[in-house]
């Protein structure tokens, strides 16, 4: 454990020196506040408070932005170290590859968690002060922050995996961009095409909701929508969420970081420094 903490402290210092802490926090805060002010108009027609609408908007924001920030932080973690010669030096220390990976993961997840808490917390506080907030909307905000951190953890670990197999920083960057595109954009487009083709058949009613849990981005969205009636009303995503048991989306989102870390460890084990 002490070796993992030592690696984590070193990685966090590097992230702070490279301005990742400030950039990630600034980007998250800027977009969250912009969506909060932009979403103030429809609250009256929906019959929910401003914080609920803001949480619904920030849920959509997090689906796109959190994986992107996570992959930007992670794609260079192994490939970049190998190119700069730092990986060979690290391998001479009394630390295993698993401990090295966990140390990097803890540090970068801490950076991402800080950005999420500050960004969404500031936007949530602004919405609550401007338009009021109930107990359900406050719980939805807390859940959004927690699930965004889980989502970020999944994509950080996936970023380490592509960093290990990319061969170079350039190759890893291309794989990371493709990974983001597949999970965040193309997967849903493919499912949408299948639903349209099925025209309300068996696939739409039984298979489609479960396929959403296969994707961590969709599992994140389903968890936040299914757990709060107000957020479901603001997003309109009630059909797929109601077709699944309550544990399905949470279980998928919790398992994804563990699965992705396992894949990253296997890929990292094949790297020769």
How would you name each of these model-derived features?
Residues 1-25, 270:
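Aromatic- and glycine-rich beta-strand/loop motifs that create alpha-glucan
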Residues 5-14, 47-51, 96-99, 238-241:
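Cytosolic juxtamembrane amphipathic/interface segments immediately preceding
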Residues 34-37, 44-62, 107-170:
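Secretory targeting signals
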Residues 41-42, 48, 181, 185-250, ...:
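Terminal transmembrane helical anchor/hairpin motif
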Residues 57-80:
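Long, hydrophobic alpha-helical segments
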Residues 67-74, 122, 157-158, 187, ...:
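Hydrophobic/aromatic residues in alpha-helical transmembrane segments
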Residues 77-113:
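Helix-loop-helix units of permease transmembrane domains in multi-pass membrane transporters
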Residues 149-199:
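A structural motif at transmembrane helix-loop-helix junctions in multipass membrane proteins
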